[in-house]
C-alpha cells in the first residue's frame, strides 16, 4: 500500500504541472517575455533567471533583442565589440528547450538604425544603405529637432541591403534553432523620404508593406514566421493614439497589404488601448505587450482573456496572448528585479513590477477559468 501511495504521489507531481500548463495554453496560448539579449558577462545570471523566474511562471515564449550582440560569421564587420559567441547562444537555446520555451531572436530591420547621436552598426559599415544620408547625426541629440530625426532607417529599395540583412537573419535563426524571427519594424519615421532617389514620391504604406512582405517571404523559405511590432499599422491621428504608438506618416494603410500570417506585437504603454481587436478583425494574429505599469498589465490581460471568450472561433485564434516588454539591457533589469538597484523615482511603475503583476494575473485567471 505504501508503495502504491508513493507511486500515486509521484504521478500527481508529474501530471499536475502538465495539466496546469495545458489549461494556460487554452487560456493564453502565448505567454511571452521580451528583453535585450544578455551580454556575455550576464549570461549565467540570465539563464538562472530563465530557470528560476520565467519557467515557474509558465512563460513559453522568449524574445531576445540581439541586433549585433552576436559574433556573426556571415558579416563579422557588423559584430558589436563585445558579443555573444555561438557556444554562449547554445547555452540559451538549451535552457529554453529544457523548459519548452520558444526562443525568438530580434534584429531591428528598416527602422531603429541609429540611437540618439550614434548611428547603428549597419549604416556605420554600409552608409550607402541610409534612407536619409543628408541628415547628419548631431553631436548632442535633442527631440524634437528640425530634421525630425528620431532613428535612422535603411532604404528598403536599396539593391544591396537585403543581401546583407538576410544573411544576418538566416544566421541568427539557425543558431537560435528557431521557427520565428522578430524584425522590429517599429517607430519608422524615415520612409519614402523626399530626397531618396529610390523612394521619393512613392506611397509610404506600399513601401512599408513591401518591406514587411519581403522579410516574411524570405523567412517562409525555411518555414519561419515573421513577428513585428504593430505601431506602424495604427492610424495615430484618427485614433488619437499619437505618433509613437501609432503612425502619422500614412504607413497604417499597410495593414491591408501585408500577409495575414504575420504575428503582431501590439504595444501600448500610456493607456491599455484595445487595438488588439483591430488587428484581429483585419485577419492578423496579435499579442498585447505591456511595459512598466502593473495596473495596465492586469487590465490588458483581463481584456485578452475576455476577447478570447467573447468572439467567434475564427477570431479567438487570432487573440494569442500577452508579452512583457523590457527596454533596458538584461543586466539592469536583473538588478532591478532582484532589488540590487531600485529606482525610488519610478515607484511601482517599473518593468519588473509590471512583469510580476502580469504573471500573477495570468496565474489567477488560470486558476479560476
Predicted regions and their residues:
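Active-site-proximal loop/turn and secondary-structure-junction residues that shape catalytic pockets
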Residues: 39, 68-70, 107-111, 187-189, ...
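Glycine-rich, aromatic-flanked loop segments that form ligand/cofactor-binding clefts
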Residues: 28, 53-66, 93-140, 177-180, ...
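Substrate-binding groove of N-acetylhexosamine-processing glycoside hydrolases
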Residues: 22, 28-31, 45-48, 55, ...
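Alpha-helix-loop-beta-strand connector modules within alpha/beta enzyme cores
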Residues: 79-101, 207-218
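Active-site-adjacent "subsite" loops/lids of carbohydrate-active enzymes
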Residues: 110-171, 288
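Acidic/histidine-rich, surface-exposed loop or edge segments in extracytoplasmic proteins
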Residues: 29-36, 73-76
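Aromatic-lined carbohydrate-binding/catalytic grooves of carbohydrate-active enzymes
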Residues: 55-89, 191, 197
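Bacterial Sec-dependent N-terminal signal peptides
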Residues: 1-22
Amino acid at each position: 500500500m505504501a508503495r502504491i501511495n508513493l507511486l500515486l504521489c509521484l504521478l500527481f507531481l508529474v501530471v499536475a504541472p502538465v495539466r496546469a500548463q495545458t489549461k494556460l495554453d487554452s487560456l493564453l496560448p502565448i505567454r511571452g517575455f521580451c528583453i535585450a539579449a544578455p551580454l556575455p558577462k550576464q549570461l549565467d545570471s540570465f539563464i538562472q533567471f530563465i530557470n528560476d523566474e520565467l519557467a515557474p511562471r509558465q512563460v513559453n515564449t522568449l524574445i531576445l533583442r540581439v541586433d549585433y550582440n552576436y559574433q556573426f560569421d556571415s558579416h563579422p564587420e557588423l559584430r558589436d565589440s563585445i558579443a555573444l559567441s555561438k557556444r554562449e547562444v547554445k547555452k540559451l537555446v538549451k535552457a529554453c528547450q529544457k523548459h519548452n520555451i520558444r526562443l525568438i531572436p530580434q534584429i531591428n530591420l528598416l527602422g531603429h538604425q541609429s540611437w540618439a547621436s550614434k548611428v547603428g552598426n549597419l549604416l556605420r559599415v554600409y552608409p550607402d544603405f541610409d534612407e536619409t544620408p543628408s541628415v547628419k547625426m548631431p553631436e548632442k541629440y535633442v527631440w524634437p529637432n528640425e530634421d525630425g530625426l528620431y532613428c535612422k532607417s535603411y532604404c528598403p529599395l536599396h539593391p544591396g541591403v537585403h543581401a546583407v540583412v538576410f544573411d544576418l537573419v538566416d544566421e541568427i535563426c539557425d543558431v537560435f534553432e528557431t521557427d520565428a524571427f522578430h524584425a522590429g519594424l517599429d517607430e519608422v519615421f524615415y520612409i519614402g523620404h523626399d530626397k531618396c532617389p529610390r523612394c521619393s514620391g512613392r506611397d509610404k504604406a506600399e513601401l512599408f508593406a513591401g518591406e514587411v512582405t519581403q522579410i516574411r517571404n524570405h523567412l517562409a523559405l525555411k518555414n519561419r514566421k515573421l513577428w513585428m511590432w504593430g505601431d506602424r499599422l495604427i492610424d495615430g491621428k484618427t485614433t488619437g493614439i499619437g505618433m509613437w504608438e501609432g503612425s502619422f506618416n500614412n504607413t497604417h494603410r499597410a495593414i491591408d497589404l501585408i500577409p495575414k500570417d504575420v504575428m503582431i506585437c501590439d504595444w501600448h504603454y500610456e493607456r491599455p488601448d484595445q487595438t488588439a481587436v483591430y488587428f484581429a478583425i483585419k485577419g492578423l494574429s496579435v499579442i498585447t505587450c505591456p511595459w512598466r505599469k502593473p495596473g495596465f498589465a492586469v487590465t490588458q490581460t483581463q481584456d485578452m482573456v475576455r476577447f478570447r471568450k467573447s468572439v467567434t472561433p475564427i477570431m479567438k485564434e487570432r487573440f494569442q496572448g500577452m508579452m512583457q516588454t523590457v527596454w533596458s539591457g538584461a543586466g539592469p533589469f536583473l538588478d532591478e528585479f532582484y532589488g540590487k538597484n531600485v529606482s525610488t523615482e519610478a515607484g511601482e511603475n517599473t518593468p519588473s513590477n509590471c512583469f510580476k503583476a502580469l504573471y500573477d494575473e495570468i496565474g489567477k485567471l488560470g486558476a479560476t477559468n
